[in-house]
A protein has these predicted regions:
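Processing junctions and N-termini across compartments
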Residues: 17, 31-34, 79
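Gly/Gly-Pro-rich "capping" loops immediately C-terminal to redox-active cysteine motifs
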Residues: 26, 30, 42-75
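Axial heme c-ligation environment in periplasmic c-type cytochrome domains
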Residues: 48-57, 75-107, 112
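A broad, structure-centric signal for solvent-exposed, well-ordered loop/edge residues
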Residues: 8, 61, 66, 92-95, ...
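The canonical Cys-X-X-Cys-His
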Residues: 29, 33-43, 85, 100
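Sequence context surrounding c-type heme c attachment/ligation sites in exported
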Residues: 27-38, 48, 69, 91-94, ...
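Post-cleavage N-terminal segment of exported redox proteins
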Residues: 1-25, 77, 106-113
Length: 113
């Protein structure tokens, strides 16, 4: 009986966790992107370096680690920045950065249409 109660309690605890802890949120990522990233990356472009867009082919060509883990590569770029891109480590939370990465990956895989 004690085991059953413990199992039920554990299940309730897991089910009550916010979905954000379980998966990235592309809708929220889009909102965060529009607030923090779209000034330079509107519609997946890049106003600073036009050849380094957020389109799939450019991410594959220019973003370290993108081919081995799409969102992981995006998370690293957003978190630590590189070249002209600023770091967002002190601006966005880990969950917010993960949401932005999920949004960018989703948009890139659909051609930013």
């Amino acid at each position: 009986m004690r085991f059953l109660l413990s199992a039920v309690f554990a299940l309730l605890l897991v089910l009550s966790m916010p979905m954000r802890a379980m998966a990235s949120d592309t809708v929220r990522g889009g909102q965060i992107f529009n607030t923090n990233c779209a000034a330079c990356h509107a519609a997946g472009g890049n106003i600073v370096k036009s050849e380094r867009t957020l389109r799939q082919a450019d991410l594959e060509a220019f973003l370290p680690n993108y081919l081995t883990g799409h969102e992981t590569g995006i998370v690293a770029q957003v978190t630590y920045g590189r070249n002209a891109m600023p770091a967002f480590l002190d601006v966005l939370s880990e969950n917010e950065i993960a949401d932005v990465a999920a949004y960018v990956e989703d948009q890139a895989s659909h051609g930013w249409s």
